[in-house]
């Protein structure tokens, strides 16, 4: 096995192991409030490192994973391991100094002067503070505190917004497995076009894609399962249920025997060979359950076309997981351990401030300069109607989305959704949209973006070519919503 099979270049100064050791189960091990022994856990990380599995993935909320990694880094692998972490801010307004504080906290925990890869998660795209966070993270990257930026659980539309707005990201970490192929189409295509790599987690589905569950009765969703098992049991249910899942396991078993491998390794190897995938993340329960030799062997074989066809045939019989990457954290069905967001966030605050106006109306303001100068609101609620002003891809002094009409359109619809949320409605309440475009040749990507966001809502709509104010803007949109009394 040569080195190129084992590692992958995310950026000129960052090469990772193609099998990344995930540490999110540290949080599960500590869920009863009992911290694991950090020195022993750091020593367990060293065993992976010594075996050539030098890359570890964690987050600010994975229990004491960052602290453990810092001990490991200082004692055993200074400058030789790749420590990938995440920042998942609490929903709501974020200030510049909070971003620096979060990065400094990660550096302190990791006992490092530079974060190899800082991955960012956004809870609510309708709240534009997520863009502020990324622009400020990019400033800290320029400053040298961060080597590379990545995303986690971003969908295709918002990855497009990020890339077209000049934010330099090299990865998007998403759930991507035999059960969940949401990343295989538009996401993979966009990543290939922009040289962004997917880091695939969930490839063994919390251990369900193994011999242990072949021909076994269906487990119940109870606290006797690990958090990981609770999460991926929900994916199994969404993909067609236990009987359909058993057919997938039988296909995996067939391919595993042919390749003299384990079912888990076949499942992960299949994902590793998908377009745009830079690495697969396989979880470790440090000090409890290590699979070092098996993870090493994942890099020692490849699947022939016959094996892939057997797996594809089994996948095609499953029910596709709905939506795009990361939707499980933003809209029903919430495919999380708890089945909701209770383990993650308490509430999603309104994206924009609202104020009581005259004659019983309420207005929402997005903070753009012209709202004050021209005397208008982003949206006004009167009775059960919400009227949203003509909205462009403006955020502070920036035009978001560059020269990509679809990226601009998606950000415009984010702002519209944020204004409606701030006045007590949802995008489902929209009954009318009007779209004004600068260039007639942009009509189709803008219409398709509208179709993605309003696919099941289908409001009345008009699209016309217009002379927009501001040469940088390709699309302007307004909306009307009627909310339930």
State where each predicted segment sits:
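Terminal-tail/helix-coil boundary detector
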Residues: 2-6, 194, 217, 221-247, ...
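N-terminal binding-site loop/beta-alpha segment at the start of enzyme catalytic domains
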Residues: 1-81, 350-353, 357, 374, ...
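Short, well-ordered amphipathic alpha-helical segments that serve as non-catalytic structural scaffolds
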Residues: 44, 97-107, 252, 407-421
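Conserved, mostly hydrophobic/aromatic
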Residues: 21, 56, 69, 83, ...
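N-terminal presequence-like segments and the immediate start of the first folded domain
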Residues: 206, 222, 335-414, 418-428, ...
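Glycine/proline-rich, positively charged
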Residues: 29, 46, 93-182, 197
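Structural preference for beta-strand elements that scaffold enzyme active sites
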Residues: 9, 16-20, 54-55, 61, ...
